[in-house]
């Protein structure tokens, strides 16, 4: 019986520690190919490259097929599916991101967007993120990955939903369990530090932190804060159903000549 094909990508770059660990675990379940950005591409969201050439380089690695892409995380998935792979992968895995992707900040996430591209092509996918810490300790993360990847390769895993998995930094000590959660309303509050270069031109460095505004344990960021692995099932139907239900019958948008 042939092994399933698994596409592995991220937004931190093909040489990051997170993607190495994710690929090592995934390779226990199938044949993996890494197609990832050539450098850090965090915050690129669902952006694609339209007006510049996209460079592609095969990385010399005896044990693993790796392609480095001079483009966004979504570029990586599109190029892999359209040009590099001979067959459709059974699963797309994105990560492990160095830092959480929770709340409204997932709209900025290249990690989540690379996984969510799969919805458009009907392939199951998971985005993995590990809470940031000083040392970025990945100890015991493989246990979580093994459990979830095994589940995802089940025939019943949906191909119109992305699992957004966030792992607390306490995973190397203790976790309280795995919890199915909803996307919260937490924001990433940015601070833009204004500076001057040697030629007196203005430039900025961005910094910031997640603002916690909820206490419901069924919310992604709150579950993480309480030591749970959070799995948020994401779909990308962005229509406000509540607004439609409340306003569609009013007729105030009717146009009469």
Give, region by region, the residue ranges found by the protein language model.
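A cross-family phosphate/adenosyl-ligand binding-site feature
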Residues: 2-6, 17-83, 87-88
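Short beta-strand segments
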Residues: 9, 35-37, 94-97, 128-129, ...
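Short glycine-rich anion-binding loops that position phosphate/pyrophosphate groups of nucleotides
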Residues: 12, 40, 72, 97-100, ...
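Glycine/threonine-rich flexible loop motifs
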Residues: 100-109
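Hydrophobic/aromatic ligand-binding patch that stacks against planar heteroaromatic rings
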Residues: 114-118
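Short, glycine-/small-residue-rich phosphate/pyrophosphate-handling segment
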Residues: 126-153
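C-terminal accessory domains and tails appended to enzymatic cores
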Residues: 158, 162-164, 168-257
């Amino acid at each position: 019986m042939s092994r399933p094909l698994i596409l592995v990508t991220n937004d931190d770059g093909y040489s990051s520690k997170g993607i190495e660990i994710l690929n090592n675990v995934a390779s226990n379940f199938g044949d993996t190919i890494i197609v990832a950005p050539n450098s850090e591409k965090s915050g690129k969201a669902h952006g694609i490259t339209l007006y510049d050439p996209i460079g592609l380089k095969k990385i010399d690695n005896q044990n693993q097929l790796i392609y480095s892409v001079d483009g966004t995380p979504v570029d990586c998935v599109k190029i892999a599916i359209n040009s590099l792979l001979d067959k459709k992968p059974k699963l797309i895995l994105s990560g492990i991101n160095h830092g959480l992707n929770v709340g409204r900040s997932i709209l900025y996430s290249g990690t989540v967007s690379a996984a969510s591209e799969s919805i458009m092509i009907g392939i199951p996918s998971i985005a993995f993120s590990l809470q940031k810490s000083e040392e970025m300790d990945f100890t015991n993360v493989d246990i979580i990955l093994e459990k979830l990847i095994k589940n995802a390769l089940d025939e019943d895993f949906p191909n119109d939903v992305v699992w957004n998995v966030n792992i607390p930094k306490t995973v190397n000590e203790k976790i309280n369990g795995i919890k199915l959660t909803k996307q919260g309303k937490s924001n990433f509050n940015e601070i833009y530090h204004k500076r001057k270069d040697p030629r007196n031109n203005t430039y900025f460095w961005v910094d910031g932190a997640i603002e916690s505004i909820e206490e419901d344990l069924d919310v992604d960021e709150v579950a993480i804060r309480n030591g749970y692995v959070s799995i948020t099932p994401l779909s990308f139907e962005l229509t406000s159903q509540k607004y439609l239900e409340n306003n569609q019958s009013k007729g105030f948008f009717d146009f009469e000549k």
